[in-house]
Each structure stands twice: as C-alpha cells, then as structure tokens.
C-alpha cells in the first residue's frame, strides 16, 4: 500500500487506511514532537491531537503522497500551540 491508496481508504472510512498512515509515520512524528516539547508524555499528547486533526481534515490534503510532510507540519504546529499554552499558564 502507498500513501495515495491509504488516504483514499481512510477518506472512505476504512480502518486499514488509517492504520497504514499511523503505523508508517508514528515513530518519526513522535520524535519531531519530542524535539519541540522535550517531554515524552506531552509528545504523545501532541501526536494524539495531531493525528485527530489530520484524519478529520484529509479532504484538505491535495497530494496524498505528501501525507508525511503535511502531518509533520500539523505536529509542529500542534506542539508550538502546546508550548504557547504552557507559557501563558506559567505567566499567571
């Protein structure tokens, strides 16, 4: 299976598509999140939120083969948002 096939399956609600997308990207995206947040538990939380965002917005993905890079941007943005929230709570 490739990303184009997996995205098509996921868009159709087929768990095999979601599974492929998750299994082939989890490890690298976990380490990406960890680089930002510096905490394993927080990195897992970031990933959970990022995958939910990505999977609910698959229709916005113009090129399915670009899924790993697209997801990477979502992970990075989610991690940055988490850091901003933590900083704002620390200020008050």
Predicted regions and their residues:
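Intrinsic, short, N-terminal disordered tails of RNA polymerase sigma-factor systems
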Residues: 1-5
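A short, charge-rich alpha-helical start-of-domain segment used by transcription regulators
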Residues: 7-31
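A short, glycine- and basic residue-enriched loop/turn
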Residues: 15, 40, 44, 58-64, ...
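Structural recognition of an alpha-helix C-terminal capping motif at a helix-to-coil junction
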Residues: 31, 45-52, 56, 65-77
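Arg/Lys-rich amphipathic alpha helix in sigma70-family domain 2
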Residues: 59-63, 76-92
């Amino acid at each position: 299976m490739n990303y184009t096939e997996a995205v098509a399956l996921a868009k159709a609600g087929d768990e095999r598509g979601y599974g492929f997308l998750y299994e082939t990207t989890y490890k690298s995206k976990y380490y990406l999140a960890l680089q930002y947040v510096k905490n394993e538990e927080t990195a897992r939380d970031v990933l959970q939120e990022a995958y939910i965002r990505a999977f609910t917005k698959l229709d916005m993905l113009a090129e399915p083969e670009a899924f790993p890079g697209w997801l990477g941007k979502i992970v990075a943005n989610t991690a940055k948002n988490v850091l901003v929230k933590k900083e704002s709570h620390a200020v008050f």
